[in-house]
Amino acid sequence: VTISGGEMLSRPDFVTALVEEAAQREISVCLDTSGFGDGDILKKLASMDNVTDILFDMKAIDDEIHHRYTGQSNQLILENLRQLSSDAAIRSKIQMRMPLISGINDGWEIIKQTAEFYQENKLQRVSLLPYHSLGISKKNHIGGHQEEFCQPDDVYVEKIKRYFEEEAVMTVEIQGKV
């Protein structure tokens, strides 16, 4: 079972009950989170034996960029990730997920800072998620507004992949290529 959302930590009582019930039924759980929520609850959930995977979204290491595009500081997120990664058993479950949006969070300094953070916290796996515009027409159809973003160049995404592999010594995959 994958528990996602919005943000799964926005419903901590429900998510905790669900993971506990899944444990009683010997059902494996994957947590899909941005890490924005109560760190103690996140660590409790992450340490449960039936939680086998944690997909952790890192939208931007730069707090100003993160705040501009999400409306929130990333300090709580980074602290929660530090706490999770300080436990080797939990750390082994973490798969970082990094959306790449051209001109927003894919600048070389941001990539280097992100790789350093991952390395400092001994994180081993990252999925790069190049932005694509699929879904824009649906959002426009239902009356939503979407800021125009650009898809990163495939060659540049490969360069980022190699950098994470070589400098941060991570296993890297590129997902969602269109």
Kindly give the residue locations of the regions a language model identified.
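Auxiliary Fe-S-binding modules of radical SAM enzymes
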Residues: L100-V178
